[in-house]
Regions:
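Glycine/threonine-rich flexible loop motifs
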Residues: 9, 78-79, 120
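Glycine/serine-rich anion-binding loops at beta->alpha junctions
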Residues: 1-14
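Conserved G/P- and acidic residue-centered "switch" motifs that form tight phosphate/ATP-binding loops
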Residues: 4, 33, 134
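Buried hydrophobic packing segments
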Residues: 16, 20, 130-133
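Oxyanion/phosphate-interacting regions
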Residues: 84-91, 104-169
């Protein structure tokens, strides 16, 4: 379960996230959102799907029209740094949302409900399924510096705003 705090408090923002990996690389993924009964799936090289509908990221090309998702750490020191990052980013984007489940947010980028998602301090199991689904839907994925993704820094977005987000984060 991703979004365990939401689950414990009976909030709808949680997901069941499963990935099959070879080494650290996800090759098949499924994310189920119980609140909406939506099932997102992907297989490496075969695309991403919501039910029978193929997924594509949004066509957003400007930060000022971008809806961005993020999450917050349980560490107060890390949350303070995250708050500073968000205060710098807020004037540049349409708005920022926090769902509480990284797997769901990654799927929301994949289907175009969000234009980007960033977070720090995730665990590999938070990331594996949603990362593959977003990638197969055409998302660009990196850390905050534009380098290969790690669970400690995750940036997933439409290709049209990725470099602007790297510069802003």
């Amino acid at each position: 379960i991703d979004g365990t705090t939401n689950f414990l408090y009976n909030l709808s923002g949680y997901a069941i996230s499963i990935a099959a990996c070879i080494g650290a690389e996800p090759i098949a993924a499924a994310v189920f959102l119980p609140a909406t009964r939506e099932l997102f799936v992907a297989a490496q090289g075969h695309g991403a799907w919501l039910g029978s509908n193929p997924l594509r990221v949004s066509s957003c090309e400007s930060l000022d029209t971008a809806l961005i998702g993020t999450g917050f750490s349980y560490s107060s020191a890390r949350r303070e740094a995250q708050g500073q990052r968000i205060s710098r980013l807020l004037p540049q984007v349409r708005d920022i949302r926090r769902c509480g489940a990284a797997a769901a947010d990654l799927c929301f980028v994949a289907c175009g409900r969000l234009d980007a998602y960033f977070e720090e301090g995730l665990q590999p199991w938070d990331l594996a399924a949603g990362q593959l689904i977003a990638s197969e839907a055409g998302a660009q994925i990196s850390n905050f510096s534009g380098e290969p993704i790690t669970p400690s820094e995750v940036l997933v977005s439409t290709p049209g705003i990725h470099s602007s987000l790297v510069a802003s984060l």
